[in-house]
Amino acid sequence: VFYPVILFIGLIRIFNKKENFFSYKQKIFANQNYTQIRQSDFLIHFASIGELNSIKFLVDRLNNKKIVLSCSTLSSFELSKKLYPNLISIFLPLDFFWNVNIFLSKTNFKKILWIDSEIWPNWLMISKKKNLKNILVNGRVSDKSYVRWSKYQNLSKIIGEQ
């Protein structure tokens, strides 16, 4: 039901240069190079360039581990590839049940690290079912977000347990 809407929005974003076909294909269809990703232990997700700049200490500490870096924007993807050419950079599949489930079934991550306040309910619930540990790094909740999340107490509880 939502797929035509999602595809239409994607075309608008591509037309407005907010996405390209490569990024949108990875986000919507969980279309990745799973041969490389399957070998990785950690997924580190950041949304913006600022969040990417804040993960240097994490990447340095995990230097002997196989890491996949995931992002949300074209600019953070390009900078990620430039700063960490030896790591795999991808666009995170969007938080739809089928998308996340396909992606996580084809990977072998041990931990997912979410930078700042990236909270994706389907990602958290499905990764919990697959016994993946989720870690929120540098997370914070603004007063506005707290009010919004408190309206969904059951979901907030599930997320808080992660």
Regions found by a protein language model. Give the residues of each.
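Active-site and donor-binding regions of nucleotide-sugar-utilizing enzymes
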Residues: 11-32, 38-162
